[in-house]
Amino acid sequence: SVPFGMTAQEMNAWLYYGDGLQLWEKVYKDFNLVPRPAGNTGVQMGGWFNKEINSTDDLKGLKMRIPGLGGEVLARAGGTPFTLAGSEIFTSLQTGVIDATEWVGPYNDRAFGLHKAAKFYYYPGWHEPGPSLECIINKDAYNNLSKQHQSIIDIACKAANIDMISDYMSKNYQALEFFQKEKVQIKQFPKEVLSKLNSISKEVLLELSNKDNLSKQVYDSYMNFLKRVRPWTLISEDGYLNSFE
């Protein structure tokens, strides 16, 4: 997933109706693999914290389990990112090895009991706004299939993609209700903090895009699509939701 990037619906639009999937296939070509989108959790949560985040100063020295690009962004903001296996998160958070952790969202976080190890539950998940899961297929095996059987695989992956985000929407709201009953302190990151993280994210992504030609192609395609699709998201989904707050 790309920090401050596309939502699940925007990502699917880019993959299926932009050139996202073609570029994905191009990236995997030399590995003799065929990728297919096969799931998405939707926007995740920002994480569980044992310290309040009131300003960018609170990010300095923050020990947080957050891998990948999000971890690089946190490091540049003054924090210390940790990469921990899921089985290590609860104990590390409870004992103070880390101050905070991101995992997924209410449904998965409840299963891990993270509300018993941290005081504050922050949103939004700026680091994973629309993480696309993949089904990876051996290219030779895929090419040896008939067109009909290839279509069956493609359609099954697309069905799994749609099913997962629908499933998460259903299970997340139920888990959120549970957290509210448990009096979990659900808080929004301050705009100052999100603005700083967004600025750093842009720097990180731009640096990555300059590493090689293929990275530049993916970056340019992704960012151009995001630039064009976001205005519609803001006046459609966001416009509707904000119209009766």
Which ranges hold each PLM region?
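N-terminal secretory/targeting leader peptides
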Residues: S1-M11, L23-E245
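Core domains of carbohydrate- and sulfate-ester-processing enzymes
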Residues: L15-L23
